[in-house]
Amino acid sequence: MSSYLEYVSCSSSGGVGGDVLSLAPKFCRSDARPVALQPAFPLGNGDGAFVSCLPLAAARPSPSPPAAPARPSVPPPAAPQYAQCTLEGAYEPGAAPAAAAGGADYGFLGSGPAYDFPGVLGRAADDGGSHVHYATSAVFSGGGSFLLSGQVDYAAFGEPGPFPACLKASADGHPGAFQTASPAPGTYPKSVSPASGLPAAFSTFEWMKVKRNASKKGKLAEYGAASPSSAIRTNFSTKQLTELEKEFHFNKYLTRARRIEIANCLHLNDTQVKIWFQNRRMKQKKREREGLLATAIPVAPLQLPLSGTTPTKFIKNPGSPSQSQEPS
């Protein structure tokens, strides 16, 4: 929502020439509480312009301005919480035609230290050098807040709000000056993030991000090594093991056709049967090696000759090669 100022010419109403600067109702509070604004200096002999803020319940500004508004003596508040703001209007006699023709420019002049933005967006008119300057900013009174930008009071929450854009458009369609005021470095208050005030105990540590039951292959993948998906161990049933052992008893090696047939009968896949036979052959070779070592250990002492005895001599009989005779 862009903020704007409504400029109404009242030179033909009531026979009193002048201009009226009013604020749209959307910039005011929801209740019908008027805001009294004090002009910075006398506004002339009745032919000058005056600055007013409409009541919040009014939809359109009053077409007839007062003849000569007197300067009210309003004492300033004792200790305002925020910086006060004044709406200043300056009008030089004889410049009413130029203002009505759209030759006057408007500008925002900041006065508060917190949310002010320096910059004068006023430019002298081409005819006679007459110009009008308006200084606006947020008005914070004791009873509530009066925001020209139409936004929420972000200062109360500790968060900065968006700056209003300065827009000027003349009533008769003549092009006007348009410029957006940007804050100077250092004048904008530092934003207070709610997450910045949290202690370090609420932050996420590195050990919280690591999986507790990470496998060794997963750890190798963290250091750059490729970790293939580990195969799940197959739990064979008793019937499956019996059939596989029976087939292994007859055939240590299976053809591909026989392997596929067994896999279909036992509700397994080809790879599971292949791996089982590989492991079974390795187990068989291991058992054979252990059996040879177990039989070779007790036979070795019997082959050594006994002390004090002569070795036995076998004499072959040509008639009966299988019989042997001992010497007498």
UniProtKB/Swiss-Prot annotation:
According to the record, the residues making up region (Disordered) are 305-328
A molecular-function term among this protein's GO annotations: DNA-binding transcription factor activity, RNA polymerase II-specific
What domain of life? Eukaryota
Signal peptide region:
none
* SUPFAM superfamilies hit by this protein: Homeodomain-like (SSF46689)
Q: Where in the cell is it found?
A: Nucleus
* One Pfam family cited in the UniProt record for this chain: Homeodomain
Motif (Antp-type hexapeptide) on chain: 204-209
Question: What residue intervals traverse the membrane?
Answer: none
Q: Which UniProt keywords apply?
A: Developmental protein, DNA-binding, Homeobox, Nucleus, Transcription, Transcription regulation
Q: What is its main location?
A: nucleus
Per the record, where are the segments of Polar residues compositional bias?
Answer: 319-328
Q: Which GO terms describe its cellular component?
A: chromatin; nucleoplasm; nucleus
Example GO BP: regulation of transcription by RNA polymerase II
Give the DNA-binding residues. Answer: 229-288
General function of this protein: Sequence-specific transcription factor which is part of a developmental regulatory system that provides cells with specific positional identities on the anterior-posterior axis. Acts on the anterior body structures.
Q: Which family, according to UniProt?
A: Belongs to the Antp homeobox family. Labial subfamily.
Name of the protein: Homeobox protein Hox-D1
State the organism of origin. Answer: Homo sapiens (Human)
